[in-house]
From Swiss-Prot:
S-adenosyl-L-methionine binds at residues 74, 94, 122-123, 139. Pathway: Quinol/quinone metabolism; menaquinone biosynthesis; menaquinol from 1,4-dihydroxy-2-naphthoate: step 2/2; Cofactor biosynthesis; ubiquinone biosynthesis. It is an enzyme of class 2 (transferase). Keywords: Menaquinone biosynthesis, Methyltransferase, S-adenosyl-L-methionine, Transferase, Ubiquinone biosynthesis. Its EC number is 2.1.1.163, 2.1.1.201. One of its GO terms (biological process) is aerobic respiration. This is Ubiquinone/menaquinone biosynthesis C-methyltransferase UbiE. One of its GO terms (molecular function) is demethylmenaquinone methyltransferase activity. It comes from the Bacteria. PANTHER family: 2-METHOXY-6-POLYPRENYL-1,4-BENZOQUINOL METHYLASE, MITOCHONDRIAL, METHYLTRANSFERASE. It comes from Paracoccus denitrificans (strain Pd 1222). Belongs to the class I-like SAM-binding methyltransferase superfamily. MenG/UbiE family. The keyword Methyltransferase applies.
Amino acid sequence: MTPDEPKETHFGFRTVAEKDKAGLVHGVFSRVASRYDVMNDLMSGGVHRIWKTAMMDWLAPRDGQHLLDVAGGTGDIAFRFLDRAPGARVTVCDMTESMLVEGRKRAEAGKQADRLAWVTGDAMALPFADDSFDRYTISFGIRNVTRIPDALAEARRVLRPGGRLMVLEFSQMPVPMLQWLYDRYSFNVIPVMGQIVANDRDSYQYLVESIRKFPDQETFATMIREAGFGRVQWRNLSMGIAALHSGWKL
């Protein structure tokens, strides 16, 4: 590739120009926003709720903390954080306005709206000052980012010294036979489910493919370290179908 040629990345299994990926991802989540939470329950059999509980257990929210939840549109992580720490605050940042609309609806139906802020923004260029937040979370979102190292660098920038990053993302199973079975379910069932429930097979085909393009647990941990985080650790969930990664701005 010459300096004048456009840089390329992946969109699921497709190769696309870097400049086009964000728009393609935005299109996916704009289309699925209204059915996003329902599909999470159906695709995982509700297990995503257990994973998010494990995330909160490890994150240990405290009153007075300010959380930035990136790619958090419908507010699932934000609401869980505030349930654990009623005296905390959460800013939810998402590039897709229609996802934020769904989150605001949920907030207005509850009692947490005054502790929540909703901001449209890009994980690779966050619209916040340095050292603004105590905690940064991103749940099932970082694999959709065009340049993951840029998003991790931004996470570190906006965290205060002593702040903590936590990522919940699909990952790789260490047992080949289990991975094979999981792949069969993912490729044969989830897109069909997306068509039936959300009338959108293609978006869920992309989501399945994007999981396979995301790095394994140790490779991603190395990326977090290279972004400048310390005390980096990871934990498998459901035998590696998903994983939690934690790092600190020291």
